[in-house]
Every structure is written in C-alpha cells, then in structure tokens.
Amino acid sequence: MAPTLATAHRRRWWMACTAVVENLLFSAVLLGWGSLLIMLKSEGFYSYLCTEPENVTNVTVGATAEPEHEEVSRMNGWLSCKAQDEMLNLAFTVGSFLLSAITLPLGIVMDKYGPRKLRLLGSACFAVSCLLIAYGASNPNSLSVLIFIALALNGFGGMCMTFTSLTLPNMFGDLRSTFIALMIGSYASSAVTFPGVKVIYDFGASFIVILVVWAGCSGLVFLNCFFNWPLEPFPGPEDMDYTVKIKFSWLGFDHKITGKQFYKQVTTVGRRLSVGSSMRSAKEQAALQEGHKLCLSTVDLEVKCQPDATAAPSFMHSVFSPILLLSLVTMCVTQLRLIFYMGAMNNILQFLVSGDQAVVSLYTSIFGVLQLLCLLTAPVIGYIMDWRLKECEDASEEPEEKDANPGEKKKKRDRQIQKITNATRAFAFTNLLLVGFGVTCLIPNLPLQILSFILHTIVRGFIHSAVGGLYAAVYPSTQFGSLTGLQSLISALFALLQQPLFLAMMGPLQGDPLWVNVGLLVVSMLGFCLPLYLICYRRQLERQLERKREDDKLFLKLNGSSNQEAFV
C-alpha cells in the first residue's frame, strides 16, 4: 500500500539517499556509451556487417582498396569495421533521443498523477532492457537488432527514474535547488556505470551474467518505490511557504494545510455565512453602507487575491516567455555538443592514436571514472542557485512581523531578484566552461583530452542543474515537469544532428573532427544570450520593486500602515 504524503515527508532523507544511488546505477547509464560500445563490439553485435579481408592480404601499398580493408579489425574474435560503428552509433542516437525526448509526456503525466507509477514503470523497463541485451548477446548474428529496442527501453526507463527523482527536492524547502543539483549530479554520474561494468567484464565475467544480475538489482528499485513513494505529487515549495503552521492531528491527519487549501476552506465558509446571495462588488458596497463591522463573506479576500491569481502565468504564457525560449537555445546547443562528443569519442581517440585500441580503451575508462565528478560538481551549481536565499525577505511573512521590524526588512534582499542573479551567474559560468571545452577539443593532443573529459563532465552536470534551478525559481511548480519535458524534447530533437555530424566526420572528413568541432564552438557562443537577458530582466524587476516601495510609502502616509489588507 502506498504511504501518505506525511509518511513520505518523514522518510524524505531515506528517499533522497536511495534516489541518488538508484540514479547512479539505473538512470542515464547510456551516457557511458564509450565503454558499452567496446563491450558490444566484443560480443559481436552487428559484426556480420564487416567483411573478412582474407582475399586482399597481399595487396600492394599502392592498391586503392587497401585503406578500406585496413579499417577491419578484430575484437574478442569478432570483426569490427566502420559499418558496424555507424549502425551502433545509430542505436545510441535512438536511445539518447528517448533519454531526453520522452520527458515531455512524462512531465505532463507526472504533474497530474505523481511520480510513483512512472518510477515503477521505469524500473521495470530498465530490467527488460538489460534482459534484451543479454538475449541479443547470446546470438548476435541473428539478434543484433534487439539492441535498438533495448537501448530505447533503457533510455525510457532511465529518464523515468531521473525525472521522478527531481520531485523529491520539493520537500527540502530553500535547499531545493541544491537537491535538484544533487539528483542531476547522480544522473550525470551514471555514465560511470558502464565503465564499471566494463572493468568487471575485463576481469572475465560473462556479459550475459552481468546483465541478468543488473536486471535483478533493478527489482530492488521497484520494491523501494512501491513501499516508500506516495501516490500524490509532492507539494511545491510555494505551497509550503504559505503553510498555516498548525497541526490538525486531532482531526485525524497530521499534514499541514497549505495556503491554497486554507483559502478554499475560508472561501467555502464565507459563502455559507454570507448574508447576501451576490458576491459582487455591489454587495460589498451595500454591506459597508449598512455599517457592518464584520464581513463574513470573502468578497474582499477574492478582490485582494485576484492579483495573485493573475500573477501565476498560464502554461502557454510560460512556453513563449523569453527565459524559456533562450534556455531552449542554450540547451539545444549544449546538448548537441555533449552528445556528439560522447557518440564520437572512441573514433576521435582512434584518430589521435592511429587506431591503437589499447590506448582507446584506457582513455575510455578514464572518461568513465571522471563521470563521478558530477556528484561533486553538480551540487556546486545548485549552491550557486541557492546563494543567499535565506537572507531574502519571505513572501509568506506575516504583515505584523514586517511592521514590527521595518529596519530589518530593508536589509533583506528580494527573493525573486536574488534567484535571477544566481541563475545569471550559473549560466554564464557554465557557458564559459563549454567554450573552454570546445577549445580543448580543437587541439589534437592526447593527454589534453583528459582536460576535455573533465570539462565535458562538469558542463553536463552544470547545465541540467542550472536549467532545473531556473525553472524552479521562475515558473510555478505545477508547470515544472511539463516545461522541463518540453525543453528536453526540443533539445533531444536538435541533438539528432549528431548522427549526420558523425557520418560527415567518418566520411568526407576521413575521421578528422576538426571542422565539426570548429562549427560547434561557434554555435556554442549562442549560450551567452540567456545570461545577458537575465541581466536585463533583473534590472526590470529592480525597477518594479522600487516602484512598489514608493507605492508602499505613499500608502503608509495616507493610512498610517503599509499593510494593504482586506477589510474584516
């Protein structure tokens, strides 16, 4: 039986810790494609596309066919060639596309029904994907096509795990961006899982046995979700900010009543006790003229709450807002840059070392180990997003408390402006690192690629954490899943360009990634548009805040108080 929200809140630390481990081992493991590619080629997936070059063993140096046949090699007794690389890279493209594109329907479903069912489905799909890869490895000459279905299920299941874990930070208040970054860090660090599996594989463990055990471990994720995750969506922090701090355990429930729920109750009671049948402003004026000192209806409450209702933008308004559109540009460019490098990394390394497979395997393992940096670096960007938020004025603060300490109120920062300032710094820093990564990719030096690995890992953890923190700061929590899913879908569609870029590198450019990297470096400059706009947006908010303060001063002079409350 599913636990209640109150029970889940008491278990939030257990759920957060297990979610980090589960994301690390079962979410976006497909990002460790470099190591998986070596194991798939060693197991013979699509090896039948390669032709044995026995009839041209003694071809002279001047023969035109020799370069084509030199690309055929053997891995663990199976043939390996360019045609095999292109087919497996296509499978990776499909899987990585679903890893991001599926988030839009997932977000819509999760916003409506909560994360529990999606997480159960995701863990089941991950287990099935492992079993399909194991089954395909039993007879690769006939079952290699299963890798497409397996990677698609792997991407879908992994994103279900990742996306549902992003709702957990709602239970941690002002630390939400930090916990979002931690979840995304574990998601990004899951690229270390396949390199870890490859180490076990290199020690002689059976590839099929490894995958079967992995599928069984996914069942533990299913059980953990079944016993600990509630059916209801986790309430957003904006609801918790307006919590009425009274526990109604004597009424049979121990959770707090949110501001929205409290307003609904007040509205219902007020309408029942209202002396009139009309709730319009005319009735309000009549009540005032009759000299009523106590207004039991909620006319004034509704009038005063109208600005708050209009302040919450509609979904379409959020979709076409400049912040979302510019974040889409930033994510599309960054996602294409990162996905292309992951998909083509083995071939880029082979170009640098002239085909030495041992060196390629070593550097692939180094890349995999460095993915653990995401667990350390992703919370950094979350900390930047949460910087000084505790020093900001609380919108849910009682008016009496604000009047009691006017001097202290002046010293506090505006929360919305501080969030925008933090997001500006986060995106500017992330894009600087992305440009630095593009520069290191242009230099054909093998040891320097370790720096490229580090920058790639940091940027991958930073960009998702920054976007998640920005959406959590700017948009309502009820739209967080849908907007994040829309962003992931569009960036995944744009990242499909990595397949033609890969074909161009392997074909006309003969394996040289220079010109592809130059083009991607130029395009990555578009990422600076978002922080520049956020600077302008922050100045606009500062001007609005100044006008509001001037209005408050005027209201104070006229009424003797700055509190603009409903008449009761």
From Swiss-Prot:
An annotated GO BP: isoleucine transport
Matching SUPFAM superfamilies: MFS general substrate transporter
Single GO MF annotation: L-isoleucine transmembrane transporter activity
Phosphoserine modified-residue sites: S274, S278, S297
Modification after translation (UniProt): Glycosylated. Dephosphorylation at Ser-274 and phosphorylation at Ser-297 increase affinity and amino acid transport activity. Phosphorylation-dephosphorylation cycle is regulated by food-entrained diurnal rhythm and dietary proteins.
Compartment annotation: Cell membrane; Basolateral cell membrane
KW Glycoprotein (keyword) present: yes
Location, primary (coarse class): membrane
Membrane-spanning parts: 20-40, 90-110, 120-140, 143-163, 180-200, 203-223, 313-333, 365-385, 434-454, 461-481, 489-509, 515-535
Keyword Phosphoprotein in annotation: yes
Keywords on record: Amino-acid transport, Cell membrane, Glycoprotein, Membrane, Phosphoprotein, Transmembrane, Transmembrane helix, Transport
Entry GO CC: basolateral plasma membrane
Regulation: Affinity and transport activity are regulated by a phosphorylation switch state at Ser-274 and Ser-297; increasing of affinity and amino acid transport activity via dephosphorylation at Ser-274 and phosphorylation at Ser-297.
Database matches in InterPro entries: MFS (IPR011701), MFS_trans_sf (IPR036259)
Catalysed reactions, semicolon-separated: L-leucine(in) = L-leucine(out); L-isoleucine(in) = L-isoleucine(out); L-methionine(in) = L-methionine(out); L-phenylalanine(in) = L-phenylalanine(out)
Membrane topology of this protein: Multi-pass membrane protein
Coiled-coil spans in chain: none
Function: Uniporter that mediates the transport of the stereospecific L-phenylalanine, L-methionine and L-branched-chain amino acids, between the extracellular space and the cytoplasm and may control the transepithelial (re)absorption of neutral amino acid in kidney and small intestine. The transport activity is mediated through facilitated diffusion and is sodium ions-, chloride ions- and pH-independent.
Family affiliation: Belongs to the SLC43A transporter (TC 2.A.1.44) family.
Protein name: Large neutral amino acids transporter small subunit 4
Lineage: Eukaryota, Metazoa, Chordata, Craniata, Vertebrata
